[in-house]
Amino acid sequence: MSDLHSSPTDQTSAPAHAGGGNRVVIVTGMSGAGKTMALKALEDMGWEAVDNLPLALAASLVRSGGGMARPLALGVDIRTRDFGVEPVLAALDHLMGESGLDVRLLFLDCEDDVLCRRFTETRRRHPMAVDRPLLDGIRHERALVSPLKRRADVMIDTTNQPPGEFKRLLAGHFGLESNGGLGVFVTSFAYRNGLPREADLVFDARFLANPHYVPELKPLTGRDPAVAQYVAADPAFGPFIESLTRLLEPLLPRFAAEGKSYLTIAVGCTGGRHRSVAIAEHLAQWMQRRGGKVELRHRELDERGS
């Protein structure tokens, strides 16, 4: 996600029936990781978004007017009055004790070098770098908020997330129309560019025959039938897919039973263009046939516009 502070927000209309008024999400994380964009996206989805409300007033806001007409998103960071790990966790526990509320903690993270670039490009001062170098301020904040990351129900890393993909992730976790049931993100990726940090399950496809070394297949991707057929012709493909689906069949309902709203499954190969793409496509189709909610992303292809 490049420059979360200045990227324009898609203008999507809120659902006609907002509903879900018993839901509360506390949005926190690293400064510059996308809290403002997240709150705006949630607002576009029908949530009431309130930023930097003093923590002592959070419970009062929930109870005001005899309850909430819409679900509530509370933005909290180190600029918030009374901010601290203990006060945030105390407010979270207090809200969770309110009868009938579904309360979640969303933590937004991002790699330090990308945060540095965002603050430098936007010429904004990091709130903890007033009297110290920018990177030192970021590292100090990371140490401060690390207990919140460990406690989070949902963690989204925005390092490589385009704004549109970031909003789709938020919609998957918090969209009012998707209340209930487990949704699955399937993503392909290149090992040479690092693991997707949001992945819950990771599978390695590098043992399969590589279409990269077939001249007529090299410029294509795993979306193309010729590449998909080449990958599927590998004798190891069938047993791998069978083992993978047999593993996922009982796992998916167990994740749903634990209250997980979205699961990210990542499939990797060397370049992220052929084998991992073909398997991710196959896996997404299998899940769709089961009637599941599936979103498919090819990280390397999407970033290159392939």
UniProtKB/Swiss-Prot annotation:
Disordered, as annotated region: 1-20
Polar residues bias (residue ranges): 1-14
Sequence positions that bind ATP: G29, M30, S31, G32, A33, G34, K35, T36
Cited InterPro entries: P-loop_NTPase, RapZ-like, RapZ-like_N, RapZ_C
One Gene Ontology molecular-function label: GTP binding
Residues where GTP binds: D77, I78, R79, T80
Alphabetical UniProt keywords: ATP-binding, GTP-binding, Nucleotide-binding
Keyword GTP-binding: yes
Pfam families in the record: PapZ_C, RapZ-like_N
Function: Displays ATPase and GTPase activities.
PANTHER family: RNASE ADAPTER PROTEIN RAPZ
Family according to the record: Belongs to the RapZ-like family.
UniProt-listed HAMAP family: RapZ_like
Protein name: Nucleotide-binding protein amb4396
